[in-house]
Structures are given as structure tokens and as C-alpha cells.
């Protein structure tokens, strides 16, 4: 698989590249960015999706831990509400690629951050076909439990995580039904016609909120959320919550949750 060099101008990419070259250039086979950052479709909702391909001897190293901590500062500056860290595999895993962890289809739309070259060739061998149904049912069970427990997001951090789970369902559904991975953005059009309007409504509302995303953080919240310490960030989210705007709350009405239930029921019948 050939992966082309990232040629955008996002500051987060430049900072990670500089950090890698200055201090950590010996521990990686490659650093890859995927998702909206790679395709130059960044909007305020966008988070940072990056894959580290680590040389095997550094997988448990202090160098790798320091890199993650230092690079997360730049990533959290890009998206203070980022709810996941780096994806990572070892160089040896390329010969038995974990397709269920990060589908190969995602990498086809990715870009290389390091090393610096017009493109690199990465040989990926998938020896074990993943059980795509497992990932799908794991996700819809999480969502179903939220509905059954009458859980609702209390702040923007929780809302983003919740919406991201919902918007991953079309991708997981496609993979489970067709036994192959797909780029998340392409999955919406690929499966939309399978569902009735009332079943698909929850996806449309989640997408609308995504497109209107504009969290209002005060200076203290922003400064606190730049910190990569997970426990500290949890405390910030709990004790200095970022309020959900009324325009978003109005969309998260009974119709939204009823549609989510209908979507889940439809999928359980289909798969």
C-alpha cells in the first residue's frame, strides 16, 4: 500500500513532525494521520486521528511514553475535547495486520507525517479475517444501555463522545453486513437507503450537530483541557463542565432517542 505525504498546513501536524525529528525519530517506522485531518476536511468538530507504527524494540519504552505525552499537548490544543489518544501497532504487526483495530480501508485515505518523503510503501498482510459483527454489536449494546438507563450527555465532552459513537454505527453496520471495512465518511451513503426515515433520523441529527459544532470554552477550561493527564481532564470535565447549547439540547428530544432505538432494532433484525 502506498501512502502519500501530508501536504496540508495544520499547525498540529507541524508540531508533531518537529517533535519527532528533534527527539524521537529513531522509534517509529512511520507516523500516519487519517480521518478528516488527512483528507483536508477539518471542521470545528474534527478530532485528531493518528496511527503510530512503532519499531518493536520501543513498544514498551520510556521514549514512546514521553512522545505520547508531549504530542498529546499539541493534539489537545487542536481539539480540547479529544476523547481518544493515538492508535498504535508495532512494525511486526504489519505482517499480521489487526484489521478489526483499524480497517485497511481507513489507511487508503491516510497521509504520512513521518518519515518525510513523497510517499511510502507499507506492506500489509491480513491473515485473520475479523469478526465485524463483534464491533457492531459492542457499539449498539453500549448505545442501547444508555437509552435503557435514560442516560443523557451533561456537557460538550460527553456529547461529542456520544455523537461520535452514533456516527460510527453506519460504518460498523456496513462492515458487518458486507464483511469488509469502509472509510467512515463513505459509509453514510453506502447504507442510508437501507433504513426508513424514522430510523435514519438520529444519524441526520447527529450530523447536524456535528456541522454546527462550536463549543464555547472559557480561558480556564481551555487551559485545563490542554493537559494530557487523563485523571486531571476527567476532573475538569466534571467540575468545570462545558455547557451544551440550547440549540443542541432542543435536537436531543424524544424523537432523537426514539430514532436511536428504531435504528438499533432494525440492525438487530438485519444482522
Residue ranges of predicted features:
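A generic fold-level signal
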Residues: 26, 43-45, 160
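Extended, well-ordered alpha-helical segments in internal regulatory regions
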Residues: 166-180
Amino acid at each position: 500500500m502506498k501512502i502519500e505525504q501530508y501536504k496540508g498546513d495544520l499547525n498540529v501536524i507541524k508540531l508533531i513532525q518537529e517533535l519527532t525529528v528533534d527527539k524521537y525519530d529513531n522509534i517509529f517506522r512511520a507516523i500516519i494521520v487519517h480521518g478528516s485531518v488527512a483528507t483536508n476536511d477539518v471542521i470545528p468538530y474534527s478530532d485528531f486521528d493518528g496511527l503510530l507504527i512503532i519499531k518493536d524494540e520501543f513498544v514498551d519504552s520510556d521514549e514512546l511514553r514521553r512522545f505520547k505525552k508531549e504530542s498529546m499537548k499539541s493534539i489537545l490544543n487542536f481539539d480540547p475535547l479529544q476523547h481518544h489518544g493515538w492508535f498504535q501497532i508495532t512494525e511486526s504487526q504489519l505482517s499480521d495486520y489487526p484489521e478489526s483495530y483499524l480497517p485497511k480501508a481507513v489507511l487508503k485515505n491516510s497521509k504520512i507525517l513521518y518519515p518525510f518523503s513523497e510517499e511510502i510503501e507499507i506492506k500489509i498482510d491480513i491473515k485473520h479475517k475479523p469478526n465485524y459483527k463483534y464491533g457492531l454489536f459492542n457499539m449498539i449494546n453500549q448505545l442501547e444501555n444508555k437509552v435503557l438507563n435514560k442516560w443523557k450527555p451533561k456537557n460538550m465532552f460527553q456529547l461529542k463522545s456520544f455523537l461520535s459513537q452514533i456516527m460510527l454505527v453506519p460504518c460498523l453496520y456496513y462492515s458487518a453486513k458486507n464483511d469488509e471495512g469502509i472509510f467512515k465518511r463513505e459509509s453514510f451513503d453506502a447504507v442510508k437507503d437501507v433504513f426508513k426515515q424514522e430510523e435514519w433520523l438520529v444519524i441526520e441529527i447527529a450530523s447536524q450537530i456535528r456541522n454546527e459544532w462550536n463549543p464555547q470554552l472559557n480561558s480556564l477550561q481551555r487551559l485545563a483541557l490542554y493537559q494530557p493527564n487523563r485523571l486531571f481532564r476527567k476532573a475538569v470535565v466534571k467540575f468545570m463542565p462545558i455547557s451544551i447549547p440550547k440549540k443542541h439540547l432542543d435536537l436531543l428530544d424524544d424523537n432523537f432517542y426514539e430514532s436511536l432505538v428504531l435504528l438499533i432494532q432494525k440492525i438487530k433484525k438485519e444482522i
